[in-house]
């Protein structure tokens, strides 16, 4: 990060045009490219100007207006999905493994291995994102993760021993891998494409606030559910995210539109026309027709 260049867009927004030009010439362009760096810089300057024109005069309350409410719901809902899919289990993985019956050292080793698995799956998600549609990407992950959470909870209802503890822990690791492959990256794809340009920063910001609030709630209730001195539910705690996921699957199916391959102009027109969620993927229209 010490040697990383500042974004030319950020420099332009700060009025540091000469520094932005230098960054474009030295850091963002290959010596073999036959492109005029000044032309690239001019395009960036124009982009920043258009961005300012679009976002000027907007307020946070605008994201809840009739015009933007549907899009705001999708953004906030996807942030909530990302947070709530693994409630309880994901907040304290090592502690969960220990409560499932693993020795402390093994529980720590499992969490370290889980970190490596998550990194590999996150890298593979780049490839998967190109192959799958946005809705499919999220829904496939949701279905698999819901199933895994139910399996963890059901196994915990059986008489506990070390073997079942390892089974629950392995399932939790698989859940984490699936999460990094699907719901985690799909959330960022969807919120970036669904939010309106004029209020994008505000919409995503409010959604992230909701995500953080849900994370705080999870961190408060998890110790109570897992701790032997409190509820002592152990793996049965997975019933909570499993049930949440079950209902969230329906929300994703009926409310999250397919935006892959659409321009922002097309998406604005489709939301303005009230295109049903499941018709987004195949919807065809005259982009320049009047919009009510």
Regions found by a protein language model. Give the residues of each.
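Short, conserved alpha-helical segments within structured domains
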Residues: 37-40, 112
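Short intracellular "coupling" helices and adjacent cytoplasmic loop segments at the cytosolic face
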Residues: 27-38
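Alpha-helical transmembrane bundle of multi-pass membrane proteins
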Residues: 1-25, 49-292
